[in-house]
Structures are given as C-alpha cells and as structure tokens.
Regions:
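A glycine- and Lys/Arg-enriched "phosphate-lid" helix/loop adjacent to the NTP-binding pocket
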Residues: 104-177
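Hydrophobic anchor at the beta1->P-loop junction of P-loop NTPases
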Residues: 14
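P-loop (Walker A) phosphate-binding loop of NTP-binding proteins
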Residues: 17
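Conserved lysine of the Walker
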Residues: 22
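ATP-dependent small-molecule kinase phosphotransfer cores
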Residues: 32, 36-126
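Conserved nucleotide-binding/hydrolysis micro-motifs of P-loop NTPases
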Residues: 47-49, 101-102, 136-142, 199-200
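Hydrophobic positions on the alpha1 helix immediately C-terminal to the Walker A/P-loop
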Residues: 25
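NTP-dependent small-molecule kinase module
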Residues: 1-5, 30, 146-236
Length: 236
C-alpha cells in the first residue's frame, strides 16, 4: 500500500486502459473545480521536461527494454512529484493527475516486470484521496482507439513484446493484460470503478458526486477573490 496523503491538499487521479474516456472526464472535472473556486493543478503521465528528449529518442530507435522503460517512466513521475505535485499538495491545492503510479503497476507488469519491484519503485508516492478507474470492455476500448487514430504507435501497441505481427491484435492483447492488472488493483488500492460505457454526462455526474463528498468540509487553497482563475498545469 502507498502512504496516506497527510498534506493539506487533495490528490485526485484517473486511471484506465487506452480508450477508457478518463481524459475527457478529468478535463471536465478540472473545469468544474475551478468554477467552484478551487485552486487546481493538472499533471499528466509522461510530461516531465527532464526526460522528454531521452524518452522520444529511445522510442524512435526502439531501445527500451521493459526494465529501462519502467525506470525512465518512474524518473518522469518522480521529477513531477518532487517539483510540482508534492509542493502544491503541501500548499493546499487540488492536484488532478491523468494517470498515476497505477499506470506503471499495470503497464510494466503487463510487460513482464516483477509486480512487487514496480510497487517498491513508487513507494515514495502517496495514496490518492480519490482514485477513479474508468472501466470499459476491451473490445470497446480497442474500437475507440483504432477508429480515432490512423495508426498505433510501436510501444503503445506492445509491439516490443512480440505478441503479434499485427499492431491492432498486439494492442488488444497488451491492453487486455493491463486491464487484468487494473482489476486486481481495485481492492488493493481502493480504486473507485466508474462504468466507462455510460454517457459522458452520466459519468461526469458520478464523478462530481464522489468529489463533492470528498471535499465536503475541506478548506484548501482558494483562488484569491477578485483575481483571474489562472490555469495551473504541467508543462507538456
């Protein structure tokens, strides 16, 4: 288990396989929270400027092994954690994260990395106050992704694992492995499951109800009265 969040801030994260619709939901939540007067910071997976060029080069040249990929992704997370996420939590800000350590727990293990080793790697992270897992059946997620993109990227499709010569088939197998890991994390880390097949509006109503309950009676860092609502987000 991750350590409990003992900072004045609130950490709210979303997870799900590719095509789950989680990014749409956290974007809507972000805008709603700001409209409610909360200071909100948004961070997304694989967005640290520290390792961006290295990651891009390694992907282009197909240099990653499962272990080196895991370590570099953790470096990205640690950089954002220490320089952005944790300081803002300590300041009483609502931090929203599109993917968190659970993404590594899913993807890295799906690539064959030891489950406990990956969890130990992220032991510095805090347990989110709210962790939403947008669950969709594998076939729906695959259909959403393949219909929205001209082609699947090499690592996104799990082509490094030699699961299939077909990128679409490899993607489906790889995402299936990740989905199995997510399902096993629901009880382990207290993930709240949201039905990703519901309408966008219905999902957002559920999300807001959960967040309202979490923030009930909580006094975080408000946006100063009379000042513009500055959008806080990570560099990408």
């Amino acid at each position: 288990m991750l350590r409990k969040n003992d900072t004045p801030g609130k950490l709210i994260i979303v997870e799900g396989i590719d095509g789950s619709g989680k990014s749409t939901q956290i974007d809507l939540l972000h805008k709603w929270l700001r409209a409610q007067g909360h200071s909100v910071y948004f961070s997304e997976w694989n967005s640290s400027g520290l390792v961006k060029s290295t990651t891009k080069t390694a992907k282009k040249r197909k240099l990653f092994t499962p272990t080196t990929f895991s370590l570099l992704q953790c470096t990205d997370f640690a950089d954002r954690w220490e320089n952005q996420i944790l300081p803002l939590l300590k300041a009483g800000v609502v931090v929203l994260a599109d993917r968190y350590a659970f993404t590594a727990f899913g993807r890295d293990v799906a690539r064959g990395v030891d489950r406990q080793w990956v969890r130990n790697l992220y032991s510095f992270a805090l347990q989110p106050d709210v962790a939403l897992f947008f669950r969709v059946p594998l076939d729906i997620a695959v259909q959403r992704i393949t219909s929205a993109r001209a082609s699947l990227k090499y690592y996104e499709a799990g082509m490094d694992l030699n699961l299939s010569e077909s990128r679409t088939e490899s993607f489906e197998i790889f995402q299936g492995r990740i989905l199995n890991e997510y399902d096993s994390m629901v009880n382990e880390f207290g993930l709240t499951v949201i039905d990703g097949t519901l309408t966008v509006q219905a999902q957002q109503r559920l999300v807001r109800d959960i967040i309202k309950q979490e923030l009930k009676g909580w006094k975080g860092l408000p946006i100063p009265e009379g000042s513009p609502q500055i959008l806080l987000q990570s560099e990408s």
